[in-house]
């Protein structure tokens, strides 16, 4: 088996083996572009490393060394040589781009002797020692996990003692002093072990570090957020160094062939003169726009533009390129399809179709369905913005508007933000690192002091759809005491600020945001998607406002209308409580009759908004105790209204308490014990449907869904009650309206006996939230407490409540579909759990033959696009 490939031996199709970066370097080499040469250690070598107890086998090591020898001959330099040493960079490169997840090591091969030879050869001792101190810092951080901050602190102290501001002002002697101090830090951190002087030891250490980084906590989190399997592994690219820090005719930069925020055509990027590549990406210094390169180095600019256009034409997609200029000679270090905002992705896809570079099908396949979430992003309310007080501005790194309380660490943001206390949070950092990813995910917005438009914060925030403003150098931040100052204003932890990620403006206070509006390209792309998909898309909604929004976003009806939400309103909750706590059927019916007008009014409003589109109504599902009063004053008021004592009412409430309510007295079990509930709901629904049909002329066919059925006889019992009342209402109103009765498949037993249940049910809708909960045997509300340990120990890679577990729960769905169709070949099949808007789950539902998926209103576009992508991938057509 071959574990190492020279760049010239690979091509773009070998992505799974060489990783994205390695495959692109090979492709660019074969296109004859100026690429520093090197070799790629494959993803299979990474898998072998883990299978081998985290060791690199002798076979792989020998192959690496043999390729290193060939590289020495090609470059005419020797590794570890004291007169003209070969230096290399070591970078990771997985199949899928994982920005900032894996770290780079530059200048590998330097040691105490080689640095002197390097200084002589380049006739630039300052440059040689600068390269060496950077290498010690990176190697210590990435390979040996010595915190970066130790080294930053030494640099800051030295600059302060010399009275200088920039790294570039350090002299040769200063840099030699840094090398000495850095080695001391290494030795102290490594229990007295000296910094490695053998370049081969350095190289093998770096390769192992890249393999190890595939499994660091932030990589695991990123993979979970982006559905990347853990067994893919990462490749390692070893590439001969070129230097952007050799003086004023050298430089380094990052550029995109189109704007990654807006999608506008034209080169967008930035560079630094006399710097190394990681300085731009890590956002340590704030760079110049690429257009200025035309003034600084016109020849390089011309060649750069030619190659950039050639790469975009070759890949037929927007490219993200890293380049270095060494003493006036341009080199490309990598290219990849650029990360972009959802807005930019849609514009680029539509423009490429108009430019005849890709087909409409390719355009639909190119959009990451999950990213459509970002399009529905808030902007500032124009009136509120006019009155806003702008305190500064920086780079608009990721679009959207955000306002929230300031927190200075990722942990605090996580604690207070989304998934924590649920506050609106703005994460403020000197610069973000990949460790901050969970804090960024919990925040409404991110503000950084350092870094450009292509820094870690910018790239990750764009990918998440989080608003980000970066590179605000005027901020003085005191992370220890948790405050920062900007233009004379002081902001402490917990104070509100507002960020505009589209303009880069920073405002004092909490500015009101307004929801997003969608561009014309979105409509074009979605109409192409709808022309390919065969799977229907409905929404989960239980009020006219959500229904209206979902239909605007393309929903074809309602797949789940939860009736219990209609009872929680102030004027209704006392009536439902009265019904629950009544002692006799008569009292219960009396209380329920008071609810009919409310429930009927709700259904009428929904049907009017739907204008003839279908609606599946789920009968009362939650355990009754959820409706009961807990506050003393509510109990007193209800006791008075029901003419009973407070003690009696409390006893009654306690009697309804359940040990395990999610598996208790809920769903169709309520209708079995209290048939009057199902009667009331049927009357309200049928009257509403008949009246709207007569008033507005819509063709309405009510779909009545009985929840939590586990047995055919159970369904028949409730169905008989429903049919009796429905027929009675039809007779009273002299109507011939049709209606369908179906069930939720959410108890595993229902899936196992779906052929029997289909004898009574005219449709199934899979309630995958409960089905997941009951199949795994853990509660959705409590699973979060232990699932993290499952991810860390690689028992699960994904949250089964967010992404359907296709091996277990999915098999129950598949079985129920097959059994249901055996009994009733034309049975309508839907899914209304949260999984209905998750792309990989939608693809699965399409493959097993469901009729439609139903999801929350804002996920409707995601489901439409995912359904189209599933159809295109399978070769199926409308």
Describe these PLM feature segments.
Residues 1-388, 414, 423-426, 433-438, ...:
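Nucleotide/phosphate-binding sheet-loop regions of phosphoryl- and nucleotidyl-transfer enzymes
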Residues 39, 449-451, 470-473, 561, ...:
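Short beta->alpha connector loops at strand-helix junctions that form conserved
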Residues 91, 518, 528-878:
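Conserved alpha/beta-domain cores
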Residues 207, 214, 376-408, 524-530, ...:
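Flexible inter-domain linker/hinge segments
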Residues 237, 407, 426-428, 447, ...:
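Structural motif
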Residues 329-331, 433-441, 445-447, 453-460, ...:
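Glycine-rich phosphate/ribose-binding loops and adjacent secondary-structure elements
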Residues 393-435, 486-524:
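Extended, non-globular alpha-helical segments
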